[in-house]
Amino acid sequence: MKLLDIVNEIIELAETDNFLGRTDVSLSFFYGEGNPIYFVNENNIIKYDDAISRAFNSDKEIEKTYTLKKYHDLLQEHFRECFSKKCSAKNEDVSSFVENLKAESIKTFSVFRDIHGIVLNSPKIPLLLGGYTIYEFASQKEFVESIFDSKTDSFPPIWCNDNPEYLIEWKAEARHFEKAIEIADEHFERFELILRYVIGSATNHFEVGVLNYQGWRQRKAYILSVEEVSNSSTTHGPREPIRLDEPYLVNEDTGYHTVWGFTTKTNLNKFQKRIMLAVEWIGQSMADPSPPSAFIKAAIALEIIFTHSENAIITPSIMNQISESIALILGSSVDERLKIESQVKKLYSLRSKIVHSGNKDISQGDYKTLLEIARSVIKKILTSDKLNSVDSVEDLYTILKKIKYSGDAISQSAGL
């Protein structure tokens, strides 16, 4: 559908008469100079929001550089007369709207947020992890301000007398600062997930957070019965900070350096995107307190790597293919591959029980085994000369098929 048609659908759905004093209004808001848009029919609210989203998603450049809210506000302002008079927009109206949006220059924003649960061995030097930069605030405040002082007449007092211990920075390309925050926050979420994957252990000894930090806390309970009164207090949360500039976290032999490097690239191939998505699902798995849910997320990480289609249902044949592929990648001998294949099939039978019958009886041992298999597959793919240049799942299966059939041929017995 053309943008013109969507805009006129939006105008038609919006009700703009005077709604003051009415009791049947489900939603109302103002646009332009205090002009109201309201909805009586709740279904029209859903249709209106859907139309706004379709309009916003119709141009990828605009979608990448504006927030949905900003786009909505600008659309209402541009077509204010059409809203108030209930008249259809014309092609030239829509063209000028898009041109005005694209006339706004794309700028580079440095977005900083507090990062918790870390410490730096060398705090006087900014730490680079892929596309992220981490600063100890006390040591680096003047350095950060000097970068922007050189580009502006004076540096505004943006810190508002705050005194964070550490800051993490992401540079975002956007047309307004709200979009820069939205983009940066997506990457800060990814940072947390990547770091969990790299740490590799679902433990509460460490917790690094930008947007989702809970920290050290107490859980108290007060217990009463007819015969006694009692209370309980337990501590939860990280016991010590992570030393974020340890070489282990960027080790090339484990592929961690490559994973961080992927965060700086905008042109990842299809398979590299799968790897990064699998890393994020492993990070989600490690943060999930529910054993069945954490188990499923670890399985999803493997399925992202090995399934041809995102819509594929995990049938027995696909499960066999995944198990065999994992065995070929991780095993170094026939016996080891047979053992791994059997192990993965057993773990996938547990996945099936969770999904189809709601089974909650997942042992820590089974979960940790699946988690380590998922992490090991990614490590092997990123560090193996045969696999680190794979650019699609089809390419991966071509290589694995050659490995599978590279064994000795079955020879004919003598005398036959």
Please identify what each model-predicted range represents.
Residues N18-Y31:
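N-terminal ordered "arm"
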Residues N269-A278, S325, K345-R351:
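Active-site-adjacent bridging/hinge elements
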Residues W281-I282, N320-G331, S349, K353-S357:
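Surface-exposed loop-to-helix/strand elements on domain peripheries
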Residues Y48, S58, I300-L338:
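Flexible secondary-structure boundary motifs
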Residues L277, A294-A298, I318, I322, ...:
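Residue-level detector of well-ordered alpha-helical segments, enriched
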Residues F29-G34, Y38-E42, F295, R337-D391:
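Charge-enriched, short contiguous segments at helix-coil
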Residues L4-N8, E12, G21, I37, ...:
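Charged, non-catalytic interaction/linker regions at domain boundaries
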